[in-house]
Amino acid sequence: MNLLSFDHVLKNPQDYVSEIYTYGFQDVADGRHIFRNIQPRGYHDDFAKFVSKLFPDYKIELNFVRRSPLNQEEPNFIHSDEMMGDITCILYLNEMAPVEDGTTIYDEDKNPLFVIYSKFNRMIAFDSNVFHSRNIFENFGYEESARLIQVIFLKYKK
């Protein structure tokens, strides 16, 4: 398993988050699952540019922001993103989050290996076939204080 973590990813993260909130969020159906509070992003936003430079041998398959307020119903908890790509990148976008917020990484038997804590403007990247979950099952906050992350799935260029 490979895992990377970078702090201070975006040059102007407060402006970036403000811009996200100007566009709003939507629910996206994927088969029998509904992913709530999603904002699709393009291939050229600041996070996508950072990730593309960091991983030049990969292409962006999907780029979106997700807002997850307290008690929002989610389609999964412990899961892998194997069907989405080869590398999963998560950018934490809350200036103020509960100290326990972040991502837990699991082994193949879904036993916790380690916990990564969120920090505003921190990115983590890991192999998409790795089991992981948000640290706080029920999410947190409301409206602009709700959990806010950006996710990019990368696929190896063949």
Stretches with model-predicted labels:
Residues M1-N76:
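Non-heme Fe(II)/2-oxoglutarate
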Residues L70-K158:
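Catalytic core of non-heme Fe(II) oxygenases with the double-stranded beta-helix
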